[in-house]
From Swiss-Prot:
Lineage: Bacteria, Pseudomonadati, Pseudomonadota, Gammaproteobacteria, Alteromonadales
Keywords of this entry: Glycosyltransferase, Lipid A biosynthesis, Lipid biosynthesis, Lipid metabolism, Transferase
Role: Condensation of UDP-2,3-diacylglucosamine and 2,3-diacylglucosamine-1-phosphate to form lipid A disaccharide, a precursor of lipid A, a phosphorylated glycolipid that anchors the lipopolysaccharide to the outer membrane of the cell.
Top-level taxon of origin: Bacteria
Example of a GO biological process term: lipid A biosynthetic process
Transmembrane segments: none
Protein name as it appears in the record: Lipid-A-disaccharide synthase
Pfam family, one: LpxB
Originating organism: Shewanella sediminis (strain HAW-EB3)
GO terms under cellular component: membrane
Length: 380
């Protein structure tokens, strides 16, 4: 292994957001190491840069405690195979990108075998299950955090952490172009649009497609001229959403788009979306939003007992105040969603837009380059 000129970086990315972060990090590392090898689990953006996937990253796209338990045997088998493969490769370091319940355990095993480990995207230890910090301390040589308030938490526990900012804040312009987004998507330049984003995972659509399309039907009755547009991550999710549409709102017209979720948000006047990274994107494109989310009752009951926070969306967590409406679990109903969207459509968005702008500027730090610098410093 030649770490100085031709290093191998092992990586595991969970979900689309991890694929985006992984691709940015690979690009930044390739500037320093043009002949580096990247191997593990990654998505299409990472693979387009030469990443070698041992397993499909769909393997890790599991939501909820109950849902994870149902696939636990498969996940453990994937992790064992990865440990063997990565140890045989002897990488300069391993970088786990998000997916903490999978990656932290993997990092623990790899670090015990002498491989340097980095965890990119801090688990929400400040939000729930705070005692995970002790396992993270054992498992990682460095945590790369995306959010500014996270580093103080790690410093308090003497865990090496570097705040790098967020690649989405770097990629999305401070002022998003609604007209350009509509032209790209072939949407009406003058119509009012509500973007409906029920999530990227099958489990999310199973929980959210019904209340989202029912809410859209109610909104259509209140605002007859409004139009709807929904991005779906792939054909499988599109078919799943179309099934829900047919079942719960057969007369509702929604423009369906494969991919282009960011452009859909930029093209919209208001956004209804699932909790998660998408709430950050919605904030960064400066659009009013309503966040709604639910999981299985058992998952929620277990998770609720471990939560340290009472807000879930990133705009609210970053600001420390309630900037956006959150409708969680039993509040995730079509009537409450429709009321919240109506309030956004009828309100002056200017003060909130300015707050979103300030939050955007605080996260815009050339994250991929800063993350790469931290990794390079670790392996040199």
């Amino acid at each position: 292994m030649s770490e100085t000129t031709h290093p191998t970086f092992a990586m595991v990315a969970g979900e689309l957001s991890g694929d985006i972060l992984g691709a940015g990090l690979i690009k930044a590392l390739q500037h320093q190491y043009p002949d580096a090898r990247f191997v593990g689990i990654g998505g299409p953006r990472m693979e387009a840069l030469g990443f070698e996937s041992i397993f499909s990253f769909e393997e890790l796209a599991v939501m909820g405690i109950v849902e994870v338990l149902s696939r636990l045997q498969r996940l453990l088998k994937v992790r064992k195979t990865l440990i063997d493969e990565i140890c045989s490769i002897e990488p300069a370091c391993f970088i786990g990108i998000d997916a903490p319940d999978f990656n932290i355990g993997l990092e623990l095993k790899l670090k015990a075998r002498g491989i340097k480990t980095v965890h990119y995207v801090s688990p929400s230890v400040w939000a729930w299950r705070p005692k995970r910090i002790f396992k993270i301390a054992k498992a990682t040589d460095m945590v790369l955090s995306l959010l500014p308030f996270e580093k103080a938490f790690y410093d308090k526990h003497d865990v090496p952490c570097t705040f790098v900012g967020h690649t989405l804040a770097d990629d999305i312009p401070l002022i998003s172009d609604k007209t350009a987004a509509r032209n790209l998507l072939g949407l009406d330049a003058d119509a009012e649009y509500l973007a409906v984003l029920p999530g990227s995972r099958g489990g999310e659509l199973k929980q959210l497609a019904e209340p989202f399309v029912k809410a859209a039907s109610l909104i259509k009755k209140r605002y007859p001229d409004i139009r709807f547009v929904t991005p779906l991550v792939n054909q499988k999710r599109r078919e799943q959403f179309e099934e829900a549409l047919k079942l719960h709102a057969p007369d509702l017209e929604i423009t369906l788009v494969e991919g282009h979720s960011r452009e859909v948000m930029a093209a919209s006047d208001c956004i209804l979306l699932a909790s998660g990274t998408a709430t950050l994107e919605a904030m960064l494109v400066k659009r009013p939003m309503v966040v709604a989310y639910r999981v299985s009752p058992i998952t929620y009951k277990i998770a609720k007992g471990m939560m340290q926070i009472d807000q879930y969306s990133l705009p609210n967590l970053l600001s420390g105040e309630t900037l956006v409406t959150e409708l969680i679990q039993e509040n995730c109903t079509e009537s409450l969603i429709a009321d919240a969207i109506s309030e956004q459509l009828d309100s002056d968005f200017s003060p909130l837009k300015e707050k979103f702008m300030q939050l955007h500027k605080g996260l815009k730090c050339n994250a991929s380059e800063r993350a790469a610098e931290a990794v390079i410093k670790l392996i040199q």
